[in-house]
Amino acid sequence: MSKKLLLFQPLRIIFIALTVGLVGCNYVGNLFNSPAITTESSGESNKNLPKVVATNSVICDLVKQVAEKTVNLTCLISPGVDPDRYQPKAGDRQAIEQAKIIFFNGYNFEPTNLFKLIKGSKNGAAKIAVAQRAVPKPLLYRKNGKLVSNPYVWHHPKNGIKMAEVISANLSKAIPDNAFLYGRNTQKIKKQLNQLDVWIKLRIDSIPAKNRKFVATNDDAMIYYTKAYNLASINALEKINNVKPTSGRIKEVVREIRRSTVPTIFIDSTSNSNVINTVAKQAQVQVAARQLLAENLGKPGDNGDTYQKMLTANTRTIVEGLGGTYLIFEPQAVANKN
């Protein structure tokens, strides 16, 4: 072997080692900045991979982050679609019948027609209620006059960690050859969501104490967030959200908002903004410049098109609306010890 080759070989080894180290340390940042997932099965390239179905965009994104490209993933309720108005498509039944694992939220989040498809499938697929398993003692809220379990557990990143762990455990059970990969990815998700939790607390703490009041069209969906970060939730707009309210009801809501002295009210992405704008004008408050993502993730290319980005986008909307100081979330590099 020539002296030149002997000289360059150790340099090459050093370069590879440095590259691997940098990739491991920067994974958390890359995970946060990764592009949005697709909402359809990926087609020809992975047709022989185990088929997995996820019902909503939050669970779908977490499955994608845990599993990477080891499964053929089909996502049913697209980002931006109100789950209550979702109608199963022709291919949904086929995807459910062919799936090895079906991940759904639970706590009655899925519309009845979709839930019946899942429960009625006869293929022996594992049917995993991710939110129910992750958070067995959920918060309660009043719906149609009854106290029921609140399904929107993902609005607290600590619950997001538990959801990722449920997904990872069940993928590992069904596809044991990839268990190491799933466990490693889940640890990376956990590290980043813990960082996000700290960042959200700091941003909410920057809001003046007198403004830490939350009025939104779908504040029931944000209960896990408001409770975790000590925002007083004032359930006013729920009374007129997505219904045709009477003038008397509008006046009642306007009075309640004025009493609350909030500077800004919030609209979520699935609500009708016309009535809310009328209420805001009469109550002399602002409507937040950005919509909240309460029911699902943002559409591909939007600010909230992954789980982590949704949490940061909602936090920005709330902090800026209530007079706090918004600073961009910058995930810290975490070394990969595996």
Predicted regions and their residues:
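Bacterial N-terminal signal peptides
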Residues: P10-G24
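Extracytoplasmic metal-acquisition and chelation regions
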Residues: R12, C25-N338
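Generic secretory/membrane-interface signal
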Residues: L6, A17-V20, N150, Q308
